[in-house]
């Protein structure tokens, strides 16, 4: 039987312009022997803490608004990334769009319309990316992100943490236990865009791995639709290994209409970090 870990605060020192402040590289495959938990700081001690120190603590009800803001902004960033940058991951779609552009020329014999065709296609991609991702966001904000306490803090094997810098919540991450597979799923990781590049995401990821180790799970899994290479490098630096990939992933809220399939594609990648042999 797994049990939730006691409330604790993990202190991580973050230096302002240091891009890898948290120790751990690709060479460090498994290094998740957890340090002893430290007691929460009292107000007198908190005054002496430097402003470049990040604290990762468990979610509290008063964090709800900031947590939802960080999650919302992080998901909304994926609209242009999916619409435009994501196209480079879809060679078949590139070929199809090129074919449609050529067909436009042969059917209209208009150079102007042919030159406008790629712009129309990109506009349609942005429209459908926004539509699908907003539907997904609406679904999330009305399920687990609507009541974090009920979804993550109360169930056994799950937890939610926030990263706090200078009294402000700047990052979030969740762990959801799957008893049937003896794994923990890393979910909802996001860092405020103003505080990225300081090692906060890596510290949040390590917190989930420590939690899994303390509760005797065999592994940690995650699935991501992130387009940016930096996100995938982060997971690999934590020790995760890619286990699968889908080019035809269906997000919650998708209708799968012909136009949506034509103008919205997203790659879903699965990762796993094996903590111990079962």
Model regions: which residues?
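Conserved catalytic-core motifs of GNAT/GCN5-like acyltransferases
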Residues: 9-10, 41, 128, 138-144, ...
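Cytosolic, low-complexity regulatory segments enriched in Ser/Pro/Gly with interspersed Lys/Arg
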Residues: 1-53
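Acetyl-CoA-dependent GNAT
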Residues: 12, 75-80, 85-98, 102-187, ...
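Conserved GNAT acetyl-CoA-binding A-motif
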Residues: 212-224
